Every structure is written in C-alpha cells, then in structure tokens.
Curated annotation (Swiss-Prot):
Protein's gene: UBAP2L
Quaternary organization: Interacts with BMI1. Part of a complex consisting of UBAP2L, BMI1 and RNF2. Interacts with G3BP1 (via NTF2 domain); promoting stress granule formation.
UBA domain location: 49-89
Feature: compositional bias, Basic and acidic residues: 118-132
Any one GO BP annotation for this protein: hematopoietic stem cell homeostasis
Taxonomic source organism: Homo sapiens
Annotated region (Disordered), positions in chain: 1-33, 92-234, 377-420, 440-493, 530-656, 669-794, 865-901, 1040-1087
Protein name from the UniProt record: Ubiquitin-associated protein 2-like
MF terms (GO), sorted A to Z: RNA binding
Associated disease: Neurodevelopmental disorder with impaired language, behavioral abnormalities, and dysmorphic facies: A disorder characterized by global developmental delay, speech delay, variably impaired intellectual development, behavioral abnormalities, and dysmorphic facial features. Additional features include early feeding difficulties, failure to thrive, short stature, mild visual impairment, hypotonia, seizures, and distal skeletal defects of the hands and feet.
Matching CDD domains: UBA_UBP2_like (cd14277)
Post-translational modifications reported in the UniProt record: Acetylated.
Phosphoserine modified-residue sites: 356, 360, 410, 416, 439, 454, 467, 470-471, 477, 604-605, 608-609, 852, 859
Length: 1087
C-alpha cells in the first residue's frame, strides 16, 4: 500500500501536487495552511511583494538570493525573522514547525516539531546542504519514500524536495515544513517516503518508521499528503532551488554558472559577497577587485597566517594541502596570493559555505571553479594579460587549484572524497563562476586553457613560466589584471559567453557524452582526478602552461605548449564548442573532467595517467590505455607538449610541427569544431593530414599522425566527441590520444570508437567529412590496426554508423587499391584481403557466386548455373545448400563471390532488400542463413566497409570474416550474406542482369562486373535511381545510396569515385535494373 500510495502520491503530487492533494485527498479537500503555502511556493508567478522582501533581505544581509529566499520561506515571509535567521543562523535547525500547525495527524512529532520551526528551518537548511552533500543516498533512506523521492528528483526536485513537499512542503528547509508535518508519524512516513528523511538524519531513522507509517498511515499520509501534497510540490520547488547545485553535478555547474558557485557566487558581486560571506568572500571580492597588496591584506584578513604567504596560505588554506596548490607556484605570486585569497575564500567559503551548500555542490562548484581557475590560470599564463585578472585567479590554476585544486590537493585534506572530482572542476566551477561572473573571456580562455593545461605536463612550471611574469605582473596589479580580465572578458565574453555557458552547461546538461565525461568527471574523474590529483597540479599546471599555450595558442607563442594548447586552444575551446565538448577539452578543464577526457587536454601531463585511468575506466582498453598514456603524452607531445612529450609517439613527428600543425589543424579544426560545432568540418581540415597521418595514425598514432589525424579527427571527435564515447575516445584516444585523445579515439577508434562516435558523428561528419573521415578513419582503423579491435569494440560502433563508418573504413581499405570501380575496388579489396584471386575475378565473382553454390569460386558453369538458378527455384534450393556452404564458403568462395558480391551489391541491396526481396526467394532463402549475418552486415555493412576485417567478424563469423574485408566491398559485404545467399541466384541474376545491364548479356561482362557495372553503372545508377523496382531498388536505394554515398565518398576520397562510384552505383543500380529485367524476371520471376 505504501508503495502504491507513495507512488501515486509521488506521481500525482509531483505532477499536480496541489490538485492531487486537494482532489485525491478528498479526506481533506480544503487546502490546509501548509498546502496553501506549498501552493504559493510552487507557484510560478512572481510575487512582487515577496521579491521585494527578498531584495530587502539581500540588501540587508548581503546573502545570496537563494539563501534569502529560503530564509524568507522558512520564516513564512517574515522579513525581520528572515534577517535574523540569515545573520544569526537558525538556531532552531532541529525543530520543526508546521505551517498549518496542522493537527498532528502525525501527532508523533507534531507538537515538538511544531515548536521549533526555525530549528526545523535550520535543519532543513542544514539538511538541505546535507542532502546536497549526500544527495540521493540519504533520500534513498526511506524505501517507499523513494518513489516520491525519485520523483522529486525527476522533477528536478530533490527526493528531498519531494520529502519536503510532504512534510516540509513550504519550508525551504525541506525538513522544516515537511518535518513539522512530517514530524508526525504520517509526516515522518511521508517525509521518508518523500525523502524528507533525507534532510534529517534523525528523520532518517524516523523515516523507516515513517515509511512504515507511510504505508500504515497511508490514509494519514494521504491526508497529510492532501495537506502536504502541496508540500511536495512546494518542497520540490524549494528543494529544486536548494538542490540545484546539489543534486546533480551538472546542476552544480549550472549553479556555478549562476554564480552560485556557492562560494564563487560571491565573486560576481564580491563586494556583496564580501560583505555577506565570511571575510573570505569579501576577500575574494576584494581580492579580485583589489591590488595584490589588497589581496594580500584580504588574505591576511582571511587568514592571517595565510596573508604572509598567500601562495602558501592559499595553497594551505585552500588546499589544506599546500603542496599541490603550490603547483601554482608560479601562481604563487601575488596573484597566487590572490588566488590564495580566492582559493581560500573559495576553499573556506566553499568549505564553510560548501558545508552548507553541500559538499557535492560545493565541490562541484569548486571543480568548476578549479577547472575554470586552471583555465584561467592557463589562460592567464598564456595570456598573462588575459588571465591576469584571472591570472590571479587564474594563477589560477592556482586559484582554481587553489580554490579547489588546492583544495584538491587538499582534497586529501578536506575534500578528499570530493577532491578527485574537484580536482579539475573546482577550478572550473570557480572559474566558471568567475568566468561567468568575472570574465566570460576567462571562461572562454579558461575553457581553452584546460586543454592546454593538459598538454603542459610541465605543470606549474610551464604555466608558471608563462605565469610567473604574468603572475608577478598581475600580482603586482591584480586590479589591472582584473581589468584586463574584464576586458578580456568582454572580448572573450562575446565569444566566450556562450562558451562559458556552454562550458558550464556541459557540466549540467552535457551531451550524454559530455555528461558521461562529466560523470566521468565524477566517477571517471575520481580516478582520473586521482591521477589528476597526483598531478592535479599538473593538470592545473598543465593547464597553466597550456594556458599560456592557450593564450599562446592564439599566438601559439609557446609553440610547444602552444601546439598543445593550440589545438586545444582551440580556443576552440574557447569557444566553446569545445566547451561543449570539447570545448573541447579545453573547456575541458572542467570538461575534462566532465567529459573531457579527453584529452587532449588530457592534460597530458595530467593526465596522461589520469587519462589513462580515465581511459581505463572508460575504455577498458588496456592497451589503448597504455597507448593512451603514451599517446597522451604523445598528445602532449603532439599536442604541443610534444614537444615534450612524448615525443614518444611522436616524437617522431615533430610534435612541434605536428603539434603546431596539428595544433593548428587542431586548432583550426577545433575552431571549426567550435564553429561548426562541428566537427566534421574541422575534420576536413585535418583531413589531409589525417589521411597521411592515418597511416601514421595507425602507427599509432604516431603522435603525429594521431595528432594530425587527430587534428582532424580530433575535430570530429571533438565533435562528437568524443563522441560520447568517452571510452571510445579514450581508446581511440589512446590511439590518437595523441592527437587528441579525443579525436583520436574517434578516428581510429577509433575505428571503433570513432566508428561509434565518430562513426556516427563522423557519419554525420562523414557526410561532409566523410571523405576525410573515412579515409582518416579508415586509415586510422586500418592504420590503427584497430580494425580488429575495432571490430570487436568497433564493430558495434561501426554498426551504428556502418554506412558512414563503412564508407570511411571502406574507402580506407580500398581507396587506394581500386580506383576504378568501387566494385572492383571493393571486390578487390575484399578479395585482396581474403582472396587475391577473387580480386581478379570480378568475373569469377559471378562465377564465384555460383562457385559459392558449387563451392567453386570460379566456375563458369556455376556462373551459368547461377543464372539458371536465379531463374529457377531449384537453384534457390541449391543456393540454400550452398547457403551453408556459402556461409562458410562465403568466407572463401563467397568471398570471391563477395567480391563479385559487389554485384551482389544488389544482393547486398537485396540484403537489405533481402528482406523485401520477394523475388529473391532464393536470395531470401539464401539470405536467411546469411541474413543473420546480413543484419550484422547491414548494420555492419558500413562497418564492414569501414573495418573490413572487423566487419568480417561481425558480419559472418566465418564467411563474413572474409567478407569483413570484403566489407570494403561495401555494403556488398553486408549484402554479401544475402548476395551470397542469393549468390547463385544473384550471380545468375547478376550475370543475367549484368548482361542486361551490360546489355551485352555477356557473362564475361558480368564477370567484368566492374566494367559492366562501370559502363552500365552510370546508366544503371540512373536507372537504379529511376528503378526503384520495388523492393529492390527500394532497399537498394537506402543501402545503396548510403553505400553509394559512402562508397562514393570513399571512392572519391580514393579518387576512385568516378569509376568506383559508377561501379558501385552501377553494380548496385545495375543490379536493380538488371534485377528488374533479368533478376526480377529471373530470380523473382523464377523464384
């Protein structure tokens, strides 16, 4: 009952808390005071009076709006009381008051709780923080309530909120209202059920009872619900407010954006905050505003001990753990001080406020700030000027680090749990906040910096290098820096603003990929961050250096870094897009955590390992990981770090060049990406590079290639970026990691991932990018040698974007091989892979089909037979037998067949067709066995194309394997199964129709399928288009078109387009045409 009640109530309440309360709870139709209050709270309409009160509160107390609103709610609109509560704190945190002073159906707690409304509020606030801190878990505490709680969450309200609604309802203190009411057993039950329990640990305990009560007192609960329902709504509303940053990190980020970076929030209004918040806040504000000395003073104010060495204090207070913060050492400078102030302010505030805010929220904010700070730091470093202001803050890294990185470092100290996450984010949050508040520019720059950050393994050193001067200068004149910042902010703002939001946004509403990343941020990030942690500074520092780079990026002055950053710099980052995703990683700082895996930013240094971890965590590819590491470094190297780093992979490629170029590419790409959002476009740029790098790529990447590829890829990856598949990213990243990890993954992915992400992305991209992508991709895939890996991992990805992917991959294989006919090329490709002989036997292929039937790949008779078969049902049967053979043969013979299968292109068509290919019963028969493969094929078909080998496994475990390569052949591959199946029939058909297509009706022609197709192709294609002969064309069209496009892309890329296109098109179209006449009459008719 509990459940049902809870559920209904939860749902109903959430959906229409008041109505339900009143309507469903007929027991108490009239609105209770609490319900009314809830309704008011829930009400969306703006209450001028209330707003006025809130403004008054804000002005008087200097607290942020959320706090004031909450306090007002808690105080039932009593401004004076709210002021006292805000300024003095609710002493009554532990008592509750029932708004309606409802009769205590839940008499248990009602009386006592009622008395201490304030206490309840306090509790609620505290609990709210707790809930934020604890988030769901506490809420989970109540079993039944969960439904409600979850609902609350769904609503964007916290479960707690839900709870609140029931009990707390009105009170912002979720607990308070809910509690007051909830106090009663029913309330408790409800409370629990709704997640009120979340707020109070005590409630927790009670909740169990409450839950029971909830169940037992369903009636009560309902009544209460009736009463409380509004609470639910209200609580939800309120909670939502409360929970914003709390429940989701994403939300936190948004909060940060909001400025509510809890601590940071003050930044925008430092003065107010200063006034409001602990000295720290003031300090922060002052610091931001003031000169270093001021900052120092502030710092002193904040932390006398800190004042002396702000940097340390900064570090110290902020991080609790000076060491890392130190990374900011360059940052240590004055601005470091400032940072320290900021950091401290953040840290303390964060901690203090964070406590109230919620560890998670706080952390989140911090992370964001930290990431931002890092960005800023990087940014500042890179452009001292730019970051100056935030340099200070940015010193960021320090600040961010300081703020949170320090904290991060401190993480061990204070937020160790959070730290990991915080590692980047804190900055980012803060930064974000700052950025948002302070300097969108920063945000932008910030965004960019992070990627750079990663590049800079040098960490602080690097950053500091850049930074130091900057830092010093900045520290000398923080204000000027700020001004700069502001200017920058304005400057960047324009572009950045969006990015800033985007960057932050991703935190909250990243794409799933981003979210994942973000999540990774959380889970992955922990490990990563961990590494991060180790290198938090690094990361931060990295950021810093990169930051410089970043800025540099623009100038790329730090080439080394620059590249790195550049790619990142992608200011892209800046913008954002990356931000978005990639903001790239730039944004990534935060993003990095968030999504970023990627890399590239990876922080390289930072991240190599983190990335690695990340990768591991995400990808699970160990090798990749390793690679990744390498790569990462490579990336670093490639990226810019390369320079340093890791040359490893890349050293060979001149990381710098590459880096630069890559970076440039990347950057460009990134920019593209950002601009494009794109991605694909960016990819194009890299395209060339990519291609050439593909091989390299495969080398792994070679950093170079990776980089370059990556550049291109990166873009795409970025684009999809990472495609979401973080893992992919990672993995590919590892491949490319270098390049960008991100990208790399996609491309090579890679293969897999790429395919996945990229694939789809690419696919998207592919369209535009496809060529590039394809080639890159395929190169990558091949090069990567990840084909096989792709296969397994990639395959699925491939499947998703088989066509797109396939083309890319496909062309990857065949492009060079066969420029003439797609078909031949594909065939060749396949055969080459599997059968060199078949390759030459385009003719044979037909025969091959027959051969398949006969198990004789090259059998003129068979071929003839095949034709006959096509017409006669018997052949179908034969086919059926061969089918098995063919399945097996497929690999072998059929491979040949497959090669010819290109023609089977129709078959392929048929394959897709095959479903609808009525005329091809044989095909159908044939198909079924193959079909299973076929489906894979068809899914894979792109894949196959893309990853022949890998496709192979997918397509046919046995037969398709060959096919796999054949896949290149294209769709055919996928067709292959069907084609194979219908191979005989089809072969015949093919021949027949080929003849028809050829119009010469020569079997040879069919053998010369490419020629025939080629010749006929052009015509046929038209025909094909024209001939939508029923299913054939029909399916053909879909498959074929994609194939054609893909193939064509491939071909085009390969430069085989003309011939290839024709061939393929012709083969497929012809087939349809032929099918129509020959095939249809033959196979379909016969069959």
């Amino acid at each position: 009952m509990m459940t049902s009640v809870g559920t209904n109530r939860a749902r109903g309440n959430w959906e229409q808390p008041q109505n339900q309360n009143q309507t469903q709870h007929k027991q108490r139709p009239q609105a209770t005071a609490e319900q009314i209050r809830l309704a008011q709270m829930i009400s969306d309409h703006n209450d001028a009076d209330f707003e006025e009160k809130v403004k008054q509160l804000i002005d008087i107390t200097g607290k942020n709006q959320d706090e004031c609103v909450i306090a007002l709610h808690d105080c039932n609109g009593d401004v004076n009381r709210a002021i006292n509560v805000l300024l003095e704190g609710n002493p009554d945190t532990h008592s509750w008051e029932m708004v309606g002073k409802k009769k205590g159906v839940s008499g248990q707690k009602d009386g006592g709780q009622t008395e201490s409304n304030e206490e309840g509020k306090e509790n609620r606030d505290r609990d709210r923080d707790y809930s934020r801190r604890r988030g769901g878990p506490p809420r989970r505490g109540r079993g039944a309530s969960r439904g409600r709680e979850f609902r609350g969450q769904e609503n964007g309200l916290d479960g707690t909120k839900s709870g609140g609604p029931s009990g707390r309802g009105t009170e912002r203190g979720r607990r308070g209202r809910g509690r007051g009411r909830g106090g009663s057993g029913r309330r408790g039950g409800r409370f629990s059920a709704q997640g009120m329990g979340t707020f109070n640990p005590a409630d927790y305990a009670e909740p169990a009872n409450t839950d029971d009560n909830y169940g037992n007192s369903s009636g009560n609960t309902w009544n209460n619900t009736g009463h409380f329902e509004p609470d639910d709504g209200t609580s939800a509303w309120r909670t939502a407010t409360e929970e914003w940053g709390t429940e989701d990190w994403n939300e936190d980020l948004s909060e940060t954006k909001i400025f509510t970076a809890s601590n940071v929030s003050s930044v925008p209004l430092p003065a107010e905050n200063v006034t409001i918040t602990a000295g720290q806040r003031i300090d922060l504000a002052v610091l931001l505003g003031k000169t270093p000395s001021t900052m120092e003073n502030d710092s002193s104010n904040l932390d006398p001990s800190q004042a002396p060495s702000l940097a340390q204090p900064l570090v110290f207070s902020n991080s609790k753990q000076t060491a890392i913060s130190q990374p900011a050492s360059g940052n240590t400078f004055s601005h470091h001080s400032m940072v320290s102030m900021l950091g401290k302010g953040f840290g303390d505030v964060g901690e203090a406020k964070g406590g109230s805010t919620t560890g998670s929220q706080f952390l989140e904010q911090f992370k964001t700030a930290q990431a931002l700070a890092q960005l800023a730091a990087q940014h500042s470093q890179s452009g001292s000027t730019t970051t100056s202001s935030w340099d200070m803050g940015s010193t960021t890294q320090s600040p961010s680090l300081v703020q949170y990185d320090l904290k991060n470092p401190s993480d061990s100290a204070v937020h160790s749990p959070f730290t990991k996450r915080q590692a980047f984010t804190p900055s980012s949050t803060m930064m974000e906040v700052f950025l948002q508040e302070k300097s969108p520019a920063v945000a932008t720059s910030t965004a960019a910096p992070p990627p750079p950050s990663s590049p800079l393994p040098s960490k602080s050193t690097s950053a500091p290098q850049m930074s130091p001067g900057s830092s010093d200068n900045q520290s000398s004149s923080p204000q000027p820096a700020q001004q700069k910042l502001k200017q920058q902010k304005k400057k960047a703002s324009l572009t950045s603003k969006i990015p800033a939001l985007a960057v932050e946004m991703p935190g909250s509403a990243d794409i799933s990929g981003l979210n994942l990343q973000f999540g990774a941020l959380q889970f992955g990030s922990e490990p990563v961050l961990s590494d991060y942690e180790s290198t938090p500074t690094t990361s931060a520092s990295s950021s810093q250096a990169p930051s410089s780079l970043y800025t540099s990026t623009a100038s790329e002055s730090s080439s080394t870094i620059s590249s790195n950053q550049s790619q990142e710099s992608g200011y892209q980052s800046g913008p954002i897009q990356s931000t978005t995703y990639t903001s790239q990683n730039n944004a990534q700082g935060p993003l990095y955590e968030q999504r970023s895996t990627q890399t590239r930013r990876y922080p390289s240094s930072i991240s190599s390992s983190p990335q690695k971890d990340l990768t591991q965590a995400k990808n699970g590819f160990s090798s990749v990981q390793a690679t990744q590491l390498q790569t990462t470094q490579s990336v670093e190297g490639a990226t810019g770090s390369a320079v340093k780093s890791d040359s490893p992979s890349t050293s060979s490629i001149p990381p710098l060049n590459e880096t630069v170029s890559a970076a440039s590419l990347l950057t460009t790409t990134n920019q593209h990406s950002s601009s494009l959002g794109g991605l694909s476009h960016s990819e194009e740029i890299p395209n060339t590079t990519t291609t050439q790098h593909s091989s390299t790529l495969s080398t792994q990447q070679n950093t170079l290639s990776s980089s370059t590829s990556s550049g291109r890829t990166s873009t795409s990856t970025l684009l999809h970026t990472s495609v979401e598949s973080e893992a992919n990213l990672h993995s590919s990243s590892s491949t490319f990691s270098t390049t960008s990890s991100t990208v790399s993954a996609p491309p090579p992915v890679v293969s897999v991932s790429s395919s996945l992400n990229s694939g789809s992305s690419l696919g998207l991209s592919l369209g535009s990018n496809s060529t590039v992508t394809a080639s890159t991709r395929s190169s990558v895939a091949t090069t990567s040698g990840k084909a096989p890996p792709n296969l397994p991992p990639g395959v699925p990805p491939l499947l998703p974007n088989p066509y797109i992917m396939a083309p890319g991959l496909l062309h990857a294989y065949p492009p060079q091989v066969y420029g003439y006919d797609d078909l031949q090329m594909l065939q060749t490709r396949f055969p080459l892979d599997y059968y060199s002989i078949p390759f030459p036997t385009p003719t044979t292929p037909l025969t091959g089909r027959d051969g398949s039937l006969a198990s004789n790949p090259y059998s003129g008779d068979l071929t003839k037979f095949g034709r006959g078969d096509a017409s006669s049902p018997a052949p179908a049967t034969t086919l059926a037998q061969p089918q098995q053979n063919q399945t097996q043969t497929h690999h072998t013979t059929q491979q040949t067949f497959l090669n010819p299968a290109l023609p089977p292109g129709y078959s392929y068509t048929s394959l897709p067709y095959y479903t609808g290919v009525p005329g091809l019963p044989s095909t159908f028969q044939y198909g079924p066995a193959v079909f299973p493969v076929a489906p894979t094929s068809s899914k894979q078909h792109g894949v196959n194309v893309s990853v022949n080998a890998s496709a192979t496994p997918f397509q046919q475990p046995s037969g398709y394997g060959s096919h796999g390569y054949n896949t290149g052949v294209s769709v055919t591959s996928s067709n292959t199964g069907v084609p194979d199946i219908s191979g005989s029939v089809y072969s015949k058909t093919q021949q027949s129709f080929e003849k028809q297509g050829f119009h010469s009706g020569t079997p040879a022609a069919s053998f010369n399928l490419p020629s025939a197709l080629g010749s006929g192709g052009p015509i046929n294609p038209a025909t094909a288009a024209a001939y939508p002969p029923a299913p054939f064309m029909h399916i053909l069209t879909p498959h074929q078109q994609p194939h054609s496009q893909i193939l064509h892309h491939h071909l085009q890329q390969d430069g085989q387009t003309g011939s290839g296109q024709r061939s393929q098109t012709s083969s497929i179209p012809q087939k349809p045409q032929t099918n129509k006449s020959a095939y249809n009459s033959y196979s379909w008719g016969a069959n």
